[in-house]
Regions:
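A positional/architectural concept
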Residues: 7, 12-65
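Residues that scaffold, gate, or flank divalent-cation-dependent active/transport sites
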Residues: 69
């Protein structure tokens, strides 16, 4: 469901795939070839939420914030992520079930591990690997991680295009 909130209307690029089981409301911008999967809630009632190009927001995730939220290009937000971040840099991956609290800034090409919890206003440098509760930087992203992140994002772009054009995956 896509809804206006007062004079705030979601702006969704025509190439983006939005599941009919997602809920998007308010001042939201979704870039080209991005995808929003079933059960996802994107609620921009306190500030604007901008999602870049080629980004995927997977099933049952929530994006909301106390202020503006900027999600970069080629970002993967895994299943059941609670994301209140101020910024998620290009090419980053937030693992399944992670929690990113208000005001956090995640640098480009970083990995937030599944189940990790990023505390309020935490700043994660580019190409960091963060694990645990609370999240701690455990190392730097390697070339194999970057390739994995690109492969996941491109796979979801392709899958979103298939869903958009056919309504189902070809097996």
């Amino acid at each position: 469901m896509i809804r206006n909130l007062g004079d705030k209307k979601p702006v969704i690029h025509p190439t983006a795939f939005i599941s009919e089981a997602a809920y998007i409301v308010g001042d939201v911008v979704i870039g080209k070839h991005s995808s929003v999967w079933p059960g996802t809630v994107i609620r921009a009632d306190n500030g604007k939420i901008v999602i870049g190009d080629g980004t995927n927001i997977q099933d049952n995730s929530v994006l909301h914030g106390d202020a503006d939220v900027q999600i970069g290009n080629g970002v993967t937000i895994g299943h059941r992520v609670m994301c209140h971040a101020a910024e998620v840099g290009d090419g980053s991956l937030i693992g399944n079930g992670a929690v990113v609290n208000d005001g956090a800034k995640i640098g480009a090409r970083s990995i937030i591990g599944s189940g990790a919890m990023i505390i309020e206003n935490m700043v994660i440098p580019n190409e960091s690997i963060v694990l645990g509760v609370p999240g701690r930087i455990k190392g730097n992203v390697k070339e194999r991680h970057l390739r994995m992140q690109i492969d996941i994002a491109q796979g979801y772009q392709k899958r979103g295009s298939i869903y958009k054009s056919q309504g189902q995956l070809e097996l």
